[in-house]
């Protein structure tokens, strides 16, 4: 071992080391940042690798064109098959040799035990014997045919870059650049696929209508003022408070925070706190909304959407049948048992005389408030 170590140290050159005999792979790609200080060789005269040839150009679909940093040269067939060991052996006639029907043995993968010994600090020499690869001419022709088919398939697909903005490859792009949509202004319409064009146009119109609805809602809501705090809801300092509390039975404007605070007061009866602070009309619930809604049809859609959303959430008071919900059948939340069964609606009880008197007193209070 000592003699081998001495021999290895003697074979190394004094200046530069063994790395000067290895071509810098970053320099071969034009990306070496070390420059003249690089430990590896920057001499490409005797180290032009096959990897420098652009494999996409050989297939006929290199999108970089003249800007590609690899060589755009396709080797001739004489160069590809100049070595006799690369060609498949000619098969004898089946009539003369009875053993010709037997399948030819497949080349075995080289055993790892035959690999060259690895010495730390020394360049790796690879395996002791080179692996012979047999490639047939029909296989190369088949690959060329597949490349042509792939290129033709790419020309039928819309360019993903042009579909979202601008494609930097321009006319050299391997993909198809679609027609410009009048709605979104993007190149997303296939020139020949009418179904794709109609589907995109329909989706664009729906998105445009939705954007217009949001624009109208913002225009309708930006100047609305809360009737309790007297602040413009869209101009509140805290962004989380820029929400409206829509009453189900009247069109007076309140922010969600103020109307919830009003309805959570404990010193008044239930009917009083459920009534509007201005018109005294009772609303059984408040709908949170990002935009102000006043139209009757739009309010009904908002109420139905709110009820559907609440109906998918389990009621914490019902607690899967273990508790009692004080709201009963009027609860918007889901009353379901552990097995998935829904609670049956209980029949409503008839109002007693005391409840009727309470309603009359509340109506008198409303009339007095209206007279003031």
From Swiss-Prot:
Q: What is this protein called?
A: Probable E3 ubiquitin-protein ligase makorin-1
What does it do? Answer: E3 ubiquitin ligase catalyzing the covalent attachment of ubiquitin moieties onto substrate proteins.
Name the enzyme group at the top EC level.
Answer: transferase
Q: Where are the zinc fingers (RING-type)?
A: 226-280
Q: What is the lineage of its organism?
A: Eukaryota, Metazoa, Chordata, Craniata, Vertebrata
Q: Where is the composition biased (Low complexity)?
A: 93-103
Q: Which reaction does it catalyse?
A: S-ubiquitinyl-[E2 ubiquitin-conjugating enzyme]-L-cysteine + [acceptor protein]-L-lysine = [E2 ubiquitin-conjugating enzyme]-L-cysteine + N(6)-ubiquitinyl-[acceptor protein]-L-lysine
Q: Name the Enzyme Commission number(s) assigned to this protein.
A: 2.3.2.27
Q: Which gene encodes it?
A: mkrn1
Q: What metabolic or biological pathway is this protein involved in? A: Protein modification; protein ubiquitination
Key words, A-Z: Metal-binding, Repeat, Transferase, Ubl conjugation pathway, Zinc, Zinc-finger
């Amino acid at each position: 071992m000592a003699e081998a170590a001495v021999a290895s140290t003697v074979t190394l050159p004094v200046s530069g080391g063994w790395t000067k005999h290895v071509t810098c792979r970053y320099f071969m790609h034009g990306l070496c940042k070390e420059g003249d200080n690089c430990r590896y060789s920057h001499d490409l005269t005797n180290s032009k690798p096959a990897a420098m040839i652009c494999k996409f150009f050989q297939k006929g679909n290199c999108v970089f064109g003249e800007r590609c940093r690899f060589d755009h040269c396709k080797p001739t067939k004489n160069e590809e098959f100049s070595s006799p060991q690369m060609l498949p052996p000619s098969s004898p006639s089946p009539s003369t040799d009875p053993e010709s029907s037997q399948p030819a043995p497949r080349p075995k993968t080289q055993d790892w035990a035959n690999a060259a010994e690895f010495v730390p600090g020394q360049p790796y020499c690879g395996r002791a014997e080179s692996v012979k690869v047999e490639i047939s001419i029909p296989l190369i022709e088949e690959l060329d045919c597949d490349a042509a088919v792939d290129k033709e398939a790419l020309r039928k697909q819309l360019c993903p870059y042009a579909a979202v903005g601008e494609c930097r490859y321009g006319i050299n792009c391997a993909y198809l650049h679609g027609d410009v949509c009048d709605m979104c202004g993007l190149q997303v319409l296939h020139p020949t696929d009418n179904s794709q064009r109609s589907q995109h146009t329909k989706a664009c119109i729906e998105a445009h209508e939705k954007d217009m609805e949001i624009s109208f809602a913002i225009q309708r809501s930006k100047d609305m003022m809360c009737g309790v705090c007297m602040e413009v809801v869209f101009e509140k300092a805290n962004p989380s408070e820029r929400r409206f509390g829509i009453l189900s039975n009247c069109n007076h404007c309140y922010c969600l925070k103020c109307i919830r605070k009003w309805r959570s007061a404990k010193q008044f009866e239930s009917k009083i706190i459920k009534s509007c602070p201005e018109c005294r009309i009772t609303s059984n619930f408040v709908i949170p909304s990002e935009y102000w809604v006043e139209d009757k049809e739009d309010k009904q859609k908002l109420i139905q959407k709110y009820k559907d959303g609440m109906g998918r959430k389990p009621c914490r008071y019902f607690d899967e049948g273990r508790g009692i919900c004080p709201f009963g059948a009027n609860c918007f939340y889901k009353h379901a048992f552990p097995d998935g069964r829904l609670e049956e609606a209980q029949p409503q009880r008839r109002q007693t005389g005391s409840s009727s008197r309470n309603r009359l007193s509340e109506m008198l209070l409303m009339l007095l408030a209206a007279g003031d």
